[in-house]
Amino acid sequence: VTFVPPGVLDAARALASGEALRALGLVGRVESALGLTLRGIAYAQLGDLEQARAALEQAVGITRDPRTRARARAALVEIALSTGEPAPAARAAKASASDLERLGDARNAAMQRLVLARAEVLLGRLSEARRVVDEVLAADLAPDLRAVASLAQAEIAVRSVSASAARAALARARSCLAEVPNQLLARALVALEQELSRPIARTLRKGIIRDVDLFAVEEVSRGEVLLVDACRRLAIGGRVTIPLAKRSVLFALLFELARGWPGSVARDELAARAFDVRKVNASHRSRLRVEIGRLRKVMDGLAAEPVATADGYVLESKRDVVVLLPPTDDEAARISILLGDGATWSAQGLAEHAGVSKSTAQRALAALVRSGGAVRTGKGKDVRYTRPGTPIASRMLLLGLVPKP
């Protein structure tokens, strides 16, 4: 039986309950592989990823114990993910989970699969992330690990605009944490609960604008109304979704008609806004007729269409018409809400969906990265942006790191 100093055992228990500062105080000077691994995890939980990486790499270099080495490498995988390298981190997480499983460490293998799920979220593959988390939850898990997985479920649901599913997952996580209190997970739980309740957008309905939370966005996205989504530039009615991000003129026409609903919009006013001109002439009016015809064709299946009136056009719809707007009118707010879907975006893609120029999108993204509202990954043509979100693998708890005394 390997002797483990009491201080190291206490540090492992402190990390297991989310007390990183206490753990760091206990192993800050311990130079064994196990001590260095615990120190690295403590640094990571506190956000000092450089010191965390250094300690963990040192542990990998000096240990002869396969399980300690595998656990230190597992922690390094999550550091790679935290520093914006989701694609290589996903590959490393799969390999790490297999290694831990082979060494009989099913608990930390499950944690690595949750790291993999986090990587899939950052890569924009929400369905794959959901599948991985569901597989983890299908096993017989301890309450603390089940709490981590339930938090993962909640974040994926938030990014999928499924507020009800997110609330149910958070309730399961809270129930687990009632059995095994953990400061780190409790903070993640509160952060996600706050995200569910805060206003994230606005709705415009019959001239009335209201701030709405994720539950309200979920409600209007179910297809019971005709939703004209100015955040993602699409229209939803019934089971039909029409993407219009790359058809800016058609979306501009639909947006203006939806904004004026149930009234009509004058021809010259509609043309000026859709074509972004100050003075409308005969050629603009002719083009307007053509574009309205195209819009009518695109809207087939939505139970709504633009119809000519004496002085303009009106949107006739069998459902109430609701416009979904960003929380504010600035470009950063529009781009931020697009990032919330979990996908990784190029600046060009965000510009197209937000209806702004690429340079405007780049300025807004730079401001979001500086403020922590966005994460930038890749280089050159491969630069992508996503929302940071809650670390769904819980920043390397790696519970059960040392043998029981």
Give residue spans per PLM region.
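Amphipathic alpha-helical segments of tetratricopeptide repeats
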Residues: 24, 31, 57-61, 94-105, ...
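Short boundary/linker motifs that mark transitions into or out of structured domains
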Residues: 186-251, 255, 297, 302-331
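Short amphipathic alpha-helical recognition elements used for nucleic-acid or partner binding
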Residues: 240-275, 295, 331-335, 341
